[in-house]
From Swiss-Prot:
Assembly notes: Part of the 30S ribosomal subunit.
Organism, scientific name: Pyropia yezoensis
UniProt-recorded Gene Ontology molecular function terms: rRNA binding; structural constituent of ribosome
Function statement: Located at the top of the head of the 30S subunit, it contacts several helices of the 16S rRNA.
Pfam family name, one: Ribosomal_S13
Name recorded for this polypeptide: Small ribosomal subunit protein uS13c
Source superkingdom: Eukaryota
């Protein structure tokens, strides 16, 4: 099992798909990496030799921000927005949608579960 960037890649998948298990690498970036290293995309992960794994690691370390570095960068960007009190930063702080979606109804994913509020009670008749 190849271990790249702290992630165990699945042995029985094609290397093109297996690379997408690394945070920050999608299918197009995976294809780009394999082109640079001259590795066939149809090879199974278990069939890679050590030299091919090393070449993939070198390209990832030198050219791309992945895994922990990328997560840290994203969280720092959000913190910066919150510190300078931009609209997006305030929405992050309040846990609301950032991009203009309606919040009177919907937005359940961002706001959390449904909170029932008691309605008006009818006065009893005399």
């Amino acid at each position: 099992m190849a271990r790249i960037a702290g992630v165990d890649l699945p042995r029985n998948k094609r290397i093109e798909i297996a690379l997408t298990y690394i945070y920050g690498i999608g299918l197009s970036r995976s294809k780009e990496i394999l082109e640079k290293t001259n590795i066939d995309a149809d090879i199974k992960c278990q069939d890679l030799n050590d030299q091919q794994v090393v070449s993939i690691r070198e390209i990832l370390e030198s050219n791309y921000q992945i895994e922990g570095d990328l997560k840290r960068f994203e969280s720092m960007s959000i913190k910066r927005l919150m510190e300078i009190s931009t609209y997006r930063g305030r929405r992050h702080r309040l846990g609301l949608p950032l991009r203009g979606q309606r919040t009177r109804t919907n937005a359940r994913t961002r706001r959390g579960g449904k909170k029932t509020v008691a309605g008006k009670k009818k006065a009893p008749r005399k």
